[in-house]
Curated annotation (Swiss-Prot):
Chief location: cytoplasm
Family (UniProt): Belongs to the xylose isomerase family.
Source species of the chain: Pectobacterium atrosepticum (strain SCRI 1043 / ATCC BAA-672) (Erwinia carotovora subsp. atroseptica)
Official protein name in the record: Xylose isomerase
InterPro entries: Xyl_isomerase-like_sf, Xylose_isom_bac, Xylose_isomerase
Catalytic residues, chain numbering: H101, D104
Encoding gene per record: xylA
Recorded superkingdom: Bacteria
Reaction equation(s) it catalyzes: alpha-D-xylose = alpha-D-xylulofuranose
Cofactor(s) needed: Mg(2+)
Length: 439
């Protein structure tokens, strides 16, 4: 089979002085950071959809890419060709993982029977390619938002037949993910929301999606899937309002349906931007609530109100992300999936390499800076000092439920309390972070 990326043999680490655009300058997979290989900290994955399915189209123009697997012909054979090229890319990029939606890898077909057949065929193809290459599946998912049947949602659809079709897709995609050794399974409710409240029963739709997620958990245990279930929050787009608005909203939903011990979150940077949060906020919130699972590493444009899905290029922003992840013990089954696409004008096939190389170097630099912050420990010490009072007798009485409003009022009066504000030292902390970033 003729190589598609014939000009590249393999992307390798060459160091910060390298001028080779097809080399890593900072991502050295075998470099030891805090006692672990850099590759094992970062757990990079390529997104099948943006990299191999998007054709360069947008709301105002047709596709600008000329990918050979996107031409007319037998859909299943083209899907196999796409898999050939995808795994060529994974191996030449030296990336350990990939992620997919069901219909990214296999044509949907014109009927449920065709869909099931195509998924079965492509699952076998992917299994063979994983075996030959050593590339693994970080997570799989089902696309329950593109087909017109999902115009009013999948699990939240007013038609139970659509709900059943979506259940079939998730059932099939979960089984394929397990077969392929996937380490997670993701659920993103692209159209689980509403366009107008005039035709929407919020209570009904919430009960529907709650039951759907319970069935997903039941199926996970039934088939013995050992991976992590993940919900990916997003506030809007394509719907006006989505029910998985942000991490805190998802956590409230999980608590309502008794799923907070079963499902974690896959946090995307651009979705945080759309929700009016920083990426740092969403990661820290997920860690604080005990539901942090994985990351879709990309960036949005703060001046644009839609999901631009650009590759991450800010070491400053991502250092704080990696700091939170390292403090939490690092990834377990999750990783850094590049849910990002090259720009519509980036029509050269090798732009795919430039985009991923830059993103991987960005995250490597962020990891190294975050590790310096962990080793230095001054930031952590200053935060601990700020809350030290809660380790004392009064603080522990409050937290352990041994105090009431009345007892605290008596305490304040008897001790003639007159507490004074203590500086938050924000500027000192910002300087401390910059010192680790820039020396």
């Amino acid at each position: 089979m003729q190589a598609y990326f014939e000009q590249i043999e393999k992307v390798r680490y060459e160091g910060s002085q390298s001028s080779n655009p097809f080399a890593f300058r900072h991502y050295n997979p075998d470099q030891e950071i805090l006692g672990k290989r850099m590759a094992d900290h970062l757990r990079f994955a390529v997104a099948y959809w943006h990299t191999f399915c998007w054709n360069g189209s947008d709301m105002f123009g047709v596709g600008s890419f000329a990918r050979p697997w996107q031409q007319s012909g037998d859909a299943l054979e083209l899907a196999k060709r796409k898999a050939d090229i995808a795994f060529e890319f994974f191996q030449k990029l030296s990336v350990p993982y990939y992620c997919f939606h069901d219909v990214d890898v296999a044509p949907e077909g014109n009927s449920l029977k065709e869909y099931l057949h195509n998924i079965a065929v492509i699952t076998d193809v992917l299994a063979e390619k994983q075996q030959d290459s050593g590339v693994k599946l970080l997570w799989g998912t089902a696309n329950c938002f593109t087909n017109p049947r999902y115009g009013a949602g999948a699990a939240t659809n007013p038609d139970p037949d659509v709900f059943a079709w979506a259940a079939t897709q998730v059932f099939t995609a979960m089984n394929a993910t397990k077969t392929l050794g996937g380490e997670n399974y993701v659920l993103w409710g692209g159209r689980e929301g509403y366009e107008t409240l005039l035709n929407t029963d919020l209570r009904q739709e919430r009960e529907q999606i709650g039951r759907f997620m319970q069935m997903v958990v039941e199926h996970k245990h039934k088939i013995g899937f050992q991976g992590t279930l993940l919900i990916e929050p997003k506030p809007q787009e394509p719907t006006k309002h989505q029910y998985d608005y942000d991490v805190a909203t998802v956590y409230g939903f999980l608590k309502q349906f008794g799923l907070e011990k079963e499902i974690k979150v896959n946090v995307e940077a651009n979705h945080a931007t759309l929700a009016g949060h920083s990426f740092h906020h969403e990661i820290a919130t997920a860690v604080a609530l005990g539901v942090f699972g994985s990351v879709d590493a990309n960036r949005g444009d703060p001046q644009l109100g839609w999901d631009t899905d650009q590759f991450p290029n800010s070491v400053e922003e991502n250092t704080l992300i990696m700091y939170e992840i390292l403090k939490a013990g690092g990834f377990t089954t999750g990783g850094l999936n590049f849910d990002a696409k090259v720009r519509r004008q980036s029509t050269d096939r090798y732009d795919l390499f430039h985009a991923h190389i830059g993103a991987m170097d960005t995250m490597a630099l962020a990891l190294k800076a975050a590790a310096r912050m962990i080793e230095d420990d001054k930031l952590n010490q200053l935060v601990a000092k700020r809350y030290a009072g809660w380790n004392g007798e009064l603080g522990q009485q409050i937290l352990q439920g041994n105090a009431s409003l009345e007892s605290l009022a008596q305490y304040a009066e008897s001790h003639q309390l007159a507490p004074q504000h203590q500086s938050g030292q924000q500027e000192l902390l910002e300087n401390l972070v910059n010192r680790h970033l820039f020396g």
